[in-house]
Amino acid sequence: MALPDFSMRQLLEAGAHFGHQSHRWNPKMQPFIFGTRNNIHIIDLAQTVPALYQALQAVSDTVAKGGRVLFVGTKRQAADVVADSARRSAQYFVNSRWLGGTLTNWKTISGSIQRLRKVDEVLAGGGQGLTKKERLMLSREKDKLEKALGGIKDMGGVPDLLFVIDTNKEQLAIKEAKRLGIPVAAIVDTNCDPDGITYVVPANDDAGRAIALYCDLIARAAIDGISRGQGALGLDIGASEEPVAEELPANLNEPEVAQVDISEPYVGEPFELLAAPRGAPDDLTKLTGVGPQLVQKLNDAGIYHYWQIAAMAPEDVAKVDAELKLNGRIARDGWINQARAFVEAAAAA
């Protein structure tokens, strides 16, 4: 794959060149303004094009290194497209009110996310033992938490880059990112302050069609990063546009693993779940998309070693996938292929 391509004509047709009324401008945007028409500032798209390419490259590079990108757009015309774009590129989003401390107080936010998971589990089980009123209250709590945290509940930690629509509205998010040294790529209109933005993309941040174009390009850049990152590991990316529950591989410096034909029967110990690891457990975070939380989930289910995953038959995959609610990740992310490669590498060492 490669970075998504776009043209100045696409930006023009989407209305990306229309700024705000000239009396509502921020003087710091003067270098990006082409002129004025009918008392409306016109943005210089000759600067927008290379700036947007730079932002796309930053997104792709961040994801290729195993980083997370957080889409931030809480205004009405951006909310839906921000969520859709983040989901299809396996990234994260905030499209409702930004909660203070989302980045700078991640520990507290994580507690709220755990509460959301607990409520989800209770309601998924039918709310047994609860009264009708208690179930209703839990359902309302879930809706409230899902609206605020649904886009980041699987993020697993602070993001590595923010993509922001409307820097005026999302000032709090930008301040938190700046405090933590997290780079920010943002669509900056003529009434905005470009200071503190790592990748300034001068463009209209109000037109729905323009916002859809920006988000689509950023999503495709993230997908390109996933392809590059997994390609560097010698992996088949499979359905790379599916969201992942944990972070992407954090270490791209692992030696490239050989491909294994999983259609061949596995020669080794048969698959079984263990009450405890046999010796030291294997580092399951080397598997694509597996982070500490998912390792704990696998351990709780009785999976500690590569050989267990390598020995899985289709019926084992289906059972474990269903019990742990992995949404097809064992097959999609190639865990069996990777586990067999690690087992063979250990045997050859």
Curated annotation (Swiss-Prot):
Belongs to the universal ribosomal protein uS2 family. One of its GO terms (biological process) is translation. The keyword Ribonucleoprotein applies. InterPro entries: Ribosomal_uS2 (IPR001865), Ribosomal_uS2_bac/mit/plastid (IPR005706), Ribosomal_uS2_CS (IPR018130), Ribosomal_uS2_flav_dom_sf (IPR023591). One of its GO terms (molecular function) is structural constituent of ribosome. The gene is rpsB. Pfam families: Ribosomal_S2. GO terms for cellular component: cytosolic small ribosomal subunit. NCBIfam families: PRK12311.1 (NF008966), rpsB_bact (TIGR01011). Keywords: Ribonucleoprotein, Ribosomal protein. This is Small ribosomal subunit protein uS2.
